[in-house]
């Protein structure tokens, strides 16, 4: 690294791709073992290996960017393109769920009673918990923007405050969604309605948990003075991801909760 004459980061040999691949093998094998032989040992080992790999890999990325200065402008540009492509792939991922929902709801089969929601399904009231969830996520979108602008203006205290509010709102959303699932009058086994509802909203809930974790890491890094007004792509990527989660929820609310009910 000391003698290179270009601005690109030539990553040194790392064990983490190997341990990551091993953890993926252990998790998938462990899942099969759990389903068929009711043993969670292999699955737990896979999850532990995966968690340790993620922690150590991202720790190395933080060291390379914050302390070693390897994330030069060309490298950051590549990271931005990578994040944009990742979010684009997530858009298509959710498009599949919306396709399944609209395919089933716009032309319901005779087996569903010829109408939507299917016979026997009592949908959730879109003006109760789902509307509260919508307002919570919209508020978190405002607070993450506040945090971003505070960071760009070198206002450290306001950035920390706004980021903490965003994380708490994300946690509140997750708790509301969990309570809604427990009180739901239908289950994932109740035909195509239950399947599309729980898979689409469940995967969105998973993305909220991932986004909240992403923001929590950014919060800890901000407390450790890792971000500056000019060098904070880790936080910017988390903000992009959070806005994506926001927009997906709006489509879910309008499609499944409001129109679909």
UniProtKB/Swiss-Prot annotation:
Could you tell me the membrane topology recorded for this protein? Multi-pass membrane protein
Q: What is the effect of changing residue 251 to L?
A: Found in two patients with a diagnosis of mitochondrial encephalomyopathy with lactic acidosis and stroke-like episodes syndrome; uncertain significance
Task: Locate the transmembrane regions by residue number.
Answer: 16-34, 41-66, 73-105, 129-152, 156-183, 191-223, 233-256
**Impact after mutating residue 200 to T:** In LHON; possible rare primary mutation
RNA-binding keyword on record = no
PANTHER family found in the cross-reference section: CYTOCHROME C OXIDASE SUBUNIT 3 (PTHR11403:SF7), CYTOCHROME C OXIDASE SUBUNIT III (PTHR11403)
Please state which protein family the record places this protein in: Belongs to the cytochrome c oxidase subunit 3 family.
Q: What is this protein called?
A: Cytochrome c oxidase subunit 3
């Amino acid at each position: 690294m000391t003698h290179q004459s270009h601005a690109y980061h030539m990553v040194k040999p790392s064990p983490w791709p190997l341990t990551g691949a091993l953890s993926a093998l252990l998790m998938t094998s462990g899942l099969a073992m759990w389903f068929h032989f009711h043993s969670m040992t292999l699955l737990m080992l896979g999850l532990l290996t995966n968690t340790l790999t993620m922690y150590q890999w991202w720790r190395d990325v933080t060291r390379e960017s914050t302390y070693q200065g390897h994330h030069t402008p060309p490298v950051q540009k590549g990271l931005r393109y990578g994040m944009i492509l990742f979010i684009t792939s997530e858009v298509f991922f959710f498009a599949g769920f919306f396709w399944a929902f609209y395919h089933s709801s716009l032309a319901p089969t005779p087996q569903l009673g010829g109408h939507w929601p299917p016979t026997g399904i009592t949908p959730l009231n879109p003006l109760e918990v789902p509307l509260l969830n919508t307002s919570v996520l919209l508020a978190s979108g405002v607070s993450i923007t506040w945090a971003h602008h505070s960071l760009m203006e070198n206002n450290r205290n306001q950035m920390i405050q706004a980021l903490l509010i965003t994380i708490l709102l994300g946690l509140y959303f997750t708790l509301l969604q969990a309570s809604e699932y427990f009180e739901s009058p239908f289950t994932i086994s109740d035909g195509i309605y239950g399947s599309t509802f729980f898979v689409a909203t469940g995967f969105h809930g998973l993305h909220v948990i991932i986004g909240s974790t992403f923001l929590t890491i950014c919060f800890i890094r901000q407390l450790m003075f890792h971000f500056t007004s000019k060098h904070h792509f880790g936080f910017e990527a988390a903000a992009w991801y959070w806005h994506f989660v926001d927009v997906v929820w709006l489509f879910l609310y309008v499609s499944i909760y409001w129109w679909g009910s």
